[in-house]
Curated annotation (Swiss-Prot):
It comes from Homo sapiens (Human). The lineage of its organism: Eukaryota, Metazoa, Chordata, Craniata, Vertebrata. Residues 106-127, 355-366 have a biased composition (Polar residues). Belongs to the CEP41 family. One of its GO terms (cellular component) is cilium. This is Centrosomal protein of 41 kDa.
Length: 373
């Protein structure tokens, strides 16, 4: 009798698919859950980019947490500036409205005030700046150097200083770059102060006024960073031993920061040690040579474009777990449309489920209360 023979060669099932080295660095976007391979990759990344030690005195701050803190501080500062500008405009409008009746009264009395009032004495003119003011030059205006031509020009607006060239007011964190001055001028995080680690070895005045102001202050922290945690860990340990309790070190330094946030947070040209190595066989390796590195700008605040880039990379880093997919959003919207009273209930204040809104608008309510306090 003939035995039953399988159709095809069973060795084809054991044959492995050949891998292309050009696309070896590309990882799958599909989350298949925890695995031993992911665990070993995470351990290798920690050993490569982080320098964890036992019994660390200082606390660590993740790069993503630092980016979220920057977005909150920048949003709160912009809201405060808008409110201040509106208040200034309202006060100017009130002043102009209040000056119109005075001008009409002065024109009606020909600049002499009410007929029944006695003319003030010269001493009253000098002591009281507002006594007997008219469209003509008074004694006080002559003394102070104000003439009729100056009055006709109207109030001169004072030139406001460029607030964007200064650090954020009432900032909850103090960012210190512990590298040398040359490295700081080449590249640093926006809003960081240069504080070389050699400054800690000074016998007299090792700390600046800003550091003393933020030391153990309620609702404020001090953040140290460098390229790869070599200097920052030493400086953080020394400062914690000297009584700093609100000290944090940026985990990974500029090396991890440049990998997760290539744009928006850093000004200047990154050093070669912090730049991510190109994978073998990639097309970018044959690009034209770059020019000389650009120095860092004297930049203290983030522009709206920088904040958009930070938010984009932050969403990419958080992954699809925190952000629902388009399919889930479409299914949820389809379910809401089937319910007849769903949309009407959403329009009522405090009634029905909350609709999907912008995360930036959701965080604005928390910003008013300063969540870092």
């Amino acid at each position: 009798m003939s035995l039953r023979r399988h159709i095809g060669n069973p060795e084809y099932l054991m044959k492995r698919i050949p891998q292309n080295p050009r696309y070896q660095h590309i990882k799958s976007r599909l989350d298949t859950g925890n695995s031993m391979t992911k665990y070993t990759e995470k351990l290798e990344e920690i050993k490569k980019n982080y320098r964890y030690k036992k019994d660390e005195l200082f606390k660590r701050l993740k790069v993503t947490t630092f980016a979220q803190l920057i977005i909150q501080v920048a949003s709160l500062s912009d809201q405060t500036l808008e409110v201040t500008a509106e208040e200034i405009q309202r006060l100017e409008d009130n002043d102009s409205a209040a000056s119109d009746p005075d001008a009409e009264t002065t024109a009606r009395t020909n600049g002499k005030g009410n007929p029944g009032e006695q003319s003030p004495s010269p001493e009253q003119f000098i002591n009281n700046a507002g006594a007997g003011d008219s469209s003509r030059s008074t004694l006080q205006s002559v003394i102070s150097g104000v003439g009729e031509l100056d009055l006709d020009k109207g109030p001169v607006k004072k030139a406001e200083p460029h607030t964007k060239d200064k650090p954020y007011p009432d900032c909850p964190f103090l960012l210190l770059d512990v590298r040398d001055r040359d490295s700081y001028q080449q590249c640093h995080i926006v809003g960081a102060y240069s504080y070389p680690i050699a400054t800690l070895s000074r016998t007299m005045n090792p700390y600046s006024n800003d550091i003393l102001e933020y030391k153990n202050a309620h609702g404020k922290i001090i953040i140290l960073y460098d390229d790869d945690e070599r200097l920052a860990s030493q400086a953080a340990t020394t400062m914690c031993e000297r009584g700093f309790e609100n000290l944090f070190m940026l985990s990974g330094g500029l090396k991890v920061l440049a990998q997760k946030f290539p744009e928006g947070l850093i000004t200047g040209s990154l050093p070669a040690s912090c730049q991510q190595a190109l994978p073998p066989g990639s097309a970018r390796k044959r690009s034209s040579p770059k020019g000389p590195p650009l120095p860092a700008e004297n930049k203290w605040r983030f522009t709206p474009e920088d904040l958009k880039k930070i938010e984009y990379y932050l969403e990419e880093e958080q992954g699809p777990a925190d952000h629902p997919s388009r399919l889930n959003q479409a299914n949820s919207s389809g379910r809401e449309s089937k319910v007849p009273g769903a949309r009407s209930a959403q329009n009522l204040p405090g009634g029905g489920p909350a609709s999907h809104s912008n995360p930036r608008s959701l965080s604005s309510g928390h910003l008013q209360g300063k969540p870092w306090k």
